[in-house]
Each structure stands twice: as structure tokens, then as C-alpha cells.
């Protein structure tokens, strides 16, 4: 029987929180938790040895190993850490040719009742064409984790199809919104300035949210991934910000509309008198490996404070606007970039949009709405 996350199920939810949400857990779990690969000449194939290991968020089914542009190896034998008792087909550690298309793996739960499909790719680092990277938010789908409500997620198209590069709190919101349609999500598609856009709205998480002192869900969308396993245990760790980016960003532009709601509350649902809600629009460019060579992904706890941050573009005050309004934010660099590190995909870019700036700490006004469209990252032109 499926768990539907009513108030009486909170204790069970915290104990059985996985992406196959069944009350038969753990034998109904069917996830890849880690993926790793071993090759004899790893330094010739990967930019960093840590790139041979992928930590897999619970909402992710497309796994991509990034390899060097000049790498000639096409056959790999990836291995997977699975949830307890699960099996995988093709066999764990079997060798395949990844040169033409992703290899599809199916993970089946120990009890045989549930399964999940993953696509695994080995991709050479791509060179971004032109000096402007465009995000128009035209591609979105409804996703579903077993036992939860449908929710919207956004994708970007590349040479191999649609890629899940955008994260949002929609999957986490679905924990408390099991009886609501996807249109009630904090992040939904709408008609935009041109084509489609994203509407971000701060929502109530209902009785369940209040019980665990997470009474609101700010509408957010970010260039990164959302790790559902941390949504209750450590909400700040659930937002994994950024993807490798091999250009030097100079400016972020786009269009927005913003209407703040009036009543701001805190984590205890106490009304904060004389406090106004505000939105967040910012970007962070950072080194994605530390001094010891370990892979780093910034999260909600350090996205603005990490010593790995190289540059930031922050729209400190998002002025309320009823009509589509153009914005432009310039990156402020704290240090020079290393061109060799840039060439090796050693920097990541995070873009963050939120209807309530302090929503990560569950402070905000239910109903505050931020709409975003036609975002552009203007980069330094490649020197010939």
C-alpha cells in the first residue's frame, strides 16, 4: 500500500524516506545511490579522478560521466551502489559501448514489484557555441515519484536529447501535497514574455509542514539538482547548486514580474510585523573541486559564503513589477579565473530564482509570486 504522507504518517515518512515510497521499505526500494567507473588510464580520460564517481540524487534518472574532449575510450563498465536487495539489468559492472547513445539500465526492487529506469552516458565536455547561453524555459514535463503527486520539472535540450539540469522544490512539496495537482506546485509553467515562462509562488505546506516546522515552500528554480533524501532531514543540503560551465560569465539578463504578498511568517508560523517579503535572483560562479581534488557542489548552506566562490551576480533588491520587466546583473569577480581549470570544466555556474528570499529558512509570505523568462548568460568572447 502506498504511503500518502498524512499527518499521522510523519514518523514513518522520516524513517522510510526514499524515492520508492512504499510501506514495504526497504525491500521495495529501487534506486541507484552511487555510480562509479574504473579505467586503467583515468587521468587521460577524466579531468579529475573524482569525476569517476557520481552521487545520485533521488530525483535523478539521467546519469552523466563527464570525460575529456580528447578521450578516445568508448567502452566502460560502470558499477552501481543500489538500495538494499535491488538488482540491475544489464548486469552491474558489465561493459558497454557508450559512443553512440546512453545505455538504459533498469533497477528492480528486492520484492520484484517496483522498478526504475536510468539512462547512463559518458559525454565529452562540450564547447559552448557563441558568447551567450540562453534559457527560455520552453521544455518541461510532469514527473512522479511512486506514491507522490505529480510535479513539474524543467529540462534543456542538447545533442543527446533532454537533460535534467534544473532543480526546484516541487519534488519536496509533493511530500505534503499528495492530494493536489501539479498546477498547485510552487513552480509551474505559464505563458511568458515570449513563449513559456516559469511562475514561482510561495505556498503553504499545510498541516504536515507545520508539524515539522516547514510551514511554507518558496517557489524556486535553480540550475542544479534537488536531492529529495535531504528535504526533511536537512533542507539546506537538498538544494545542490550548479553545473560545470566552461565559459567566463560576465552578465545575467532576463525578464521578470514580481508581486510580494503582505503577511510574512517565520518557521514557527508567527507573523513578522513590519517585515516585507522579497524575491531572489542571483548567480554564483565557483570552483567545483577543493584543494585536495575532491568534487564540490555548493548547497543552501554555503551558496553565498564558500571560499570556492569566484564571482557572483546578485539582484539585491527585486522591485515589485506587474508587467514583464527586463533585468541585468553583472558578475563581480573576487579573483581571476584559471584558464586551464576552465578548460577542464573545473568551474560551475549556479542560477537561483526564488519567490521568497529567505524561503530556505522558511520565512516568507504565502502568495508571493515571481515570474521568470528569457534568461541569458553573457560570457566573455572566446579569444582566437
Where are these regions (language model features)?
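Extracellular beta-strand ligand-recognition surfaces/modules
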Residues: 270-282, 325-369, 374-375
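Beta-rich interaction/scaffold domains
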Residues: 21-135
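Extracellular carbohydrate-recognition regions
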Residues: 125-169
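Exposed low-complexity, polar/acidic, P/S/T/G-rich flexible segments that act as propeptides
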Residues: 122-124, 365-384
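Extracellular carbohydrate recognition and processing domains
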Residues: 290-343, 365
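Extracellular-facing segments of soluble proteins and assemblies that are Gly/Ser/Thr-biased and enriched
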Residues: 207-291
Amino acid at each position: 500500500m502506498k504511503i500518502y504522507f498524512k499527518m499521522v504518517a510523519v514518523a514513518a515518512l522520516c524513517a522510510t524516506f526514499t524515492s520508492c515510497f512504499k510501506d514495504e521499505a526497504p525491500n521495495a526500494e529501487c534506486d541507484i545511490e552511487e555510480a562509479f567507473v574504473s579505467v586503467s588510464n583515468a587521468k587521460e580520460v577524466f579531468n579529475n579522478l573524482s569525476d569517476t564517481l557520481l552521487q545520485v540524487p533521488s530525483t535523478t534518472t539521467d546519469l552523466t560521466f563527464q570525460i575529456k574532449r580528447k578521450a578516445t575510450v568508448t567502452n566502460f563498465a560502470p558499477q552501481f551502489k543500489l538500495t538494499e536487495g535491488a538488482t540491475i539489468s544489464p548486469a552491474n559492472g558489465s561493459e558497454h559501448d557508450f559512443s553512440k547513445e546512453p545505455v538504459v539500465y533498469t533497477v528492480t526492487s528486492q520484492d520484484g514489484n517496483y522498478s526504475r529506469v536510468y539512462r547512463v552516458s559518458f559525454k565529452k565536455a562540450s564547447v559552448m557555441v557563441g558568447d551567450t547561453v540562453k534559457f527560455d524555459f520552453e521544455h518541461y514535463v510532469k514527473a512522479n515519484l511512486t506514491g507522490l503527486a505529480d510535479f513539474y520539472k524543467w529540462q534543456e535540450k542538447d545533442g543527446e536529447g533532454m537533460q535534467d539540469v534544473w532543480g526546484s522544490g516541487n519534488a519536496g512539496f509533493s511530500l505534503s501535497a499528495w492530494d493536489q495537482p501539479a498546477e498547485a506546485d510552487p513552480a509551474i509553467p505559464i505563458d511568458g514574455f515570449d513563449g513559456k515562462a516559469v511562475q514561482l509562488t510561495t505556498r503553504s505546506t499545510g498541516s504536515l509542514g507545520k508539524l515539522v516546522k516547514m510551514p511554507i515552500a518558496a517557489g524556486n528554480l535553480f540550475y542544479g539538482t534537488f536531492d529529495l533524501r535531504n528535504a526533511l532531514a536537512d533542507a539546506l543540503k537538498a538544494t545542490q547548486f550548479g553545473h560545470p560551465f566552461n565559459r567566463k560569465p560576465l552578465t545575467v539578463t532576463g525578464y521578470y514580474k514580481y508581486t510580494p504578498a503582505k503577511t510574512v511568517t517565520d518557521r514557527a508560523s508567527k507573523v513578522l510585523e513590519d517585515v516585507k517579503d522579497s524575491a531572489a535572483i542571483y548567480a554564483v560562479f565557483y570552483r567545483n573541486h577543493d584543494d585536495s581534488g575532491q568534487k564540490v557542489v555548493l548547497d543552501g548552506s554555503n551558496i553565498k559564503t564558500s571560499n570556492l566562490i569566484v564571482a557572483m551576480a546578485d539582484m539585491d533588491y527585486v522591485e515589485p513589477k506587474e508587467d514583464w520587466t527586463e533585468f541585468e546583473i553583472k558578475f563581480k569577480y573576487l579573483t581571476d579565473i584559471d584558464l586551464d581549470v576552465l578548460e577542464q570544466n573545473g568551474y560551475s555556474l549556479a542560477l537561483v530564482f526564488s519567490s521568497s528570499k529567505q524561503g530556505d529558512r522558511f520565512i516568507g509570505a504565502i502568495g508571493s509570486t515571481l515570474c521568470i523568462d528569457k534568461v541569458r548568460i553573457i560570457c566573455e568572447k572566446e579569444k582566437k
